[in-house]
């Protein structure tokens, strides 16, 4: 008996797709990896949006992504009528549709518009508050979270814990990894030679780059093996100064994988975070990692040097400490093993359990 699962994929085509887009791709990939012929996974997309190579069948609504987002709270446009599960991969929706017996769920990745209100727009805050109120009012809507700490916080806004299901997130298999020589050429083209400290993520105020820059300067004066600070990723909401760091911007995936592998330390110290994929990707590569205590993805990982993101001295000491950790094959294998269960296949299994 076929079970039809409809998931929203419109996030992939927004101006700032961000981590939610990674989650959408990963969930689709994980469901496909189950190789379960009884599952028919459909992506609900906006008008004219291509599939982006996802391993699913796409259906397209007759409107653009912005109008679709405004309509979804009241009208499940684009959702197949035979769907057994309708899953909103973000607070955009949809929140209804499918069979009369369909399971409806929504993923909530964070409350960052509250945690970092100063770096959110007024319109963004209003949008998320309206959607939060809508989600809380739909008693039959299951809420899927990736940060266990959200369970208690959502209870405070009227979403009972029985409705909330915590799931893991995953990391892509490395795929192609650039050679050390190729990575060295990329870095040399930007004036970086020798060891380097790596940051991966958007460049925006919430990511706390100003403190990371200062901490790295202090730590490098203690141990020069930290090398240059290299920033990889696009600019985000709100400009930030990058000081003496080397900005590579967005790089091909194979190069990013090589940078993770070759970095002396990977540092990720946001003030607030929904989940935090880069530290997991770094561990997957076997690298030494410094991450803030506000990063849910590694909050229980003993292989990570965790620091207070608001304390420059703590970040400094964390970088210095990370360099003292082993970088031999056994140490790298241990770090890889610490995130071995964070696969998109397991993410898909967690979602299927939530949809029972």
Residue ranges and their predicted role:
Residues 1-356:
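Carbohydrate transferase catalytic cores enriched for Leloir-type hexosyltransferases
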């Amino acid at each position: 008996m076929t079970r039809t699962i409809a998931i929203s994929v419109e996030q992939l085509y927004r101006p700032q797709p961000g981590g939610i887009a990674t989650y959408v791709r990963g969930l689709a990939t994980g469901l496909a990896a189950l190789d379960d012929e009884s599952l028919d996974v459909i992506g609900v997309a906006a008008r004219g949006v291509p599939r982006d190579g996802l391993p699913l069948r796409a259906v397209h609504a007759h409107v653009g992504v912005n109008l679709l987002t405004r309509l979804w709270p009241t009208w499940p446009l684009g959702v197949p009528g035979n769907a057994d599960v309708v899953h909103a991969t973000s607070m955009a929706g949809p929140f209804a549709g499918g069979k009369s017996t369909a399971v409806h769920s929504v993923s909530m990745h964070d409350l960052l518009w509250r945690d970092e209100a100063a770096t959110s727009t007024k319109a963004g805050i209003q949008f998320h508050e309206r959607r939060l109120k809508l989600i809380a009012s739909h008693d039959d809507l299951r809420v899927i979270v990736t940060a266990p700490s959200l369970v208690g916080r959502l209870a405070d806004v009227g979403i009972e814990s029985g409705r909330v299901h915590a799931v893991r997130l995953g990391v892509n298999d490395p795929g192609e990894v650039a050679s050390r020589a190729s990575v060295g050429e990329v870095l040399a083209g930007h004036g970086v030679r020798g060891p380097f400290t790596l940051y991966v993520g958007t460049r925006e105020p919430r990511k706390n780059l100003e403190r990371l820059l200062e901490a790295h300067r202090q730590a490098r004066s203690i141990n020069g093996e930290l090398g240059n600070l290299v920033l990889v990723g696009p600019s985000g909401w709100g400009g930030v100064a990058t000081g003496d760091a080397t900005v590579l911007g967005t790089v091909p995936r194979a190069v990013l994988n090589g940078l993770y592998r070759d970095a002396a330390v990977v540092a990720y110290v946001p003030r607030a975070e929904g989940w935090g994929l880069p530290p997991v990707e770094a561990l997957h590569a076997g690298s030494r990692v410094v991450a803030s205590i506000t990063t849910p993805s590694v909050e229980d990982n003993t292989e990570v040097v965790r620091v207070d993101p608001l304390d420059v001295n703590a970040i400094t000491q964390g970088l210095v400490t990370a360099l003292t950790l082993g970088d031999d094959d056994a140490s790298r294998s241990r770090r890889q093993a610490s995130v071995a269960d964070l696969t998109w296949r397991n993410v898909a299994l967690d979602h299927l359990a939530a949809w029972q």
